[in-house]
């Protein structure tokens, strides 16, 4: 590592720490010649991902573009900057773990929607309206109705169905006892 002060290539590591959720290592170094201290960061170099857009053009995956879109959707909600950063990191990690080096913008949009759906419904609707190119109020109403339907389906308590099964078992055993 070259010293930023004297350009000497000999330095020693004084301290190493994991940063950014284990995505990089921060190293505190000391130049062996001039004795100045400086910090370096070591990151994993990812293979670039190409994004295939709707118009069939390609561009390199841009993390900051993803972050901007999610920040915009989460404005004036209770979603914290750390939660947004976590979502971006998780999406980026999923893209990097994929064996494919080319992904469509629609696939990225669907990933964002999955995370925002769990994080905040308002942010989900905002992102969906831009991503889905809503043309009018009908598109919003359809999406809201779909959210409400999913909410109703997921709110059916498993305890309720268990209680129903127990009641059936009790009825069956009482019938057996009555017939004995």
From Swiss-Prot:
Biased composition (Polar residues): 171-180
GO MF annotation: an example: DNA binding
Lipoprotein in keyword set: no
InterPro entries from the UniProt entry: ATP-cone_dom, NrdR-like_N, RNR_NrdR-like
Keyword Thylakoid listed: no
Zinc finger residue ranges, unnamed: 3-34
Domain ATP-cone, first and last residues per copy: 49-139
Superkingdom field: Bacteria
CC cofactor note: Binds 1 zinc ion.
Keyword set, alphabetical order: ATP-binding, DNA-binding, Metal-binding, Nucleotide-binding, Repressor, Transcription, Transcription regulation, Zinc, Zinc-finger
Region of interest (Disordered), ranges: 148-180
Pfam family name, one: ATP-cone
Biological process, per Gene Ontology: negative regulation of DNA-templated transcription
Cofactor: Zn(2+)
Role noted for this protein: Negatively regulates transcription of bacterial ribonucleotide reductase nrd genes and operons by binding to NrdR-boxes.
Family: Belongs to the NrdR family.
Name the UniProt record assigns to this protein: Transcriptional repressor NrdR
Organism: Gloeothece citriformis (strain PCC 7424)
Gene this chain is encoded by: nrdR
